[in-house]
């Protein structure tokens, strides 16, 4: 399975959808290509928080720290947690194989 990893999306009702996803794409891109409801209003340009996702701590700790720009956008996210990230900023790597991504029940699109 070279070049692909397993990603499990956990939808707000607890339903799980596991997909095989190419390394190098973002969580936002994978969600869209699998018809999952993750908005991404700014199309990954770090101008909104509508692709806010919640990760399990094990995988959150494998990521590089969020940039200041991502942290600023996360401050606007509805239901922010200690392991919240923006789906557009999580690029899949081999070490993220098996990642579980919780899709929050609601997002907030704040236009400045």
From Swiss-Prot:
One GO MF term: 2 iron, 2 sulfur cluster binding
This protein's record includes keyword Transport: yes
Keywords: 2Fe-2S, Electron transport, Iron, Iron-sulfur, Metal-binding, Transport
Cofactor note: Binds 1 [2Fe-2S] cluster.
Binding locations of [2Fe-2S] cluster: 42, 48, 51, 88
Domain (2Fe-2S ferredoxin-type) ranges: 5-107
Biological process annotations from GO: P450-containing electron transport chain
Cofactor(s) recorded in Swiss-Prot or TrEMBL: [2Fe-2S] cluster
KW Lyase (keyword) present: no
Short name of one Pfam family: Fer2
Family per record: Belongs to the adrenodoxin/putidaredoxin family.
PANTHER family assigned to the protein according to its UniProt record, in alphabetical order: 2FE-2S FERREDOXIN-TYPE DOMAIN-CONTAINING PROTEIN, FERREDOXIN/ADRENODOXIN
Function in brief: Ferredoxin are iron-sulfur proteins that transfer electrons in a wide variety of metabolic reactions.
Name of the protein described by the UniProt record: 2Fe-2S ferredoxin
Underlying gene: fdxB
């Amino acid at each position: 399975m070279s070049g692909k990893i397993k990603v499990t999306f956990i939808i707000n009702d607890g339903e799980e959808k596991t997909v095989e996803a190419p390394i190098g794409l973002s969580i936002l891109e994978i969600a869209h290509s699998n018809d999952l409801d993750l908005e991404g209003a700014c199309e990954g340009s770090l101008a909104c928080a509508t692709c806010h996702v919640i990760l399990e701590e094990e995988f959150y700790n494998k990521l590089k720290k969020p940039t200041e720009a991502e942290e600023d956008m996360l401050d606007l996210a509805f239901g922010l947690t200690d392991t919240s990230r923006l789906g557009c900023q999580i690029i899949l790597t081999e070490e993220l194989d098996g990642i579980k991504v919780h899709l929050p029940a609601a997002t907030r699109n704040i236009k400045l």
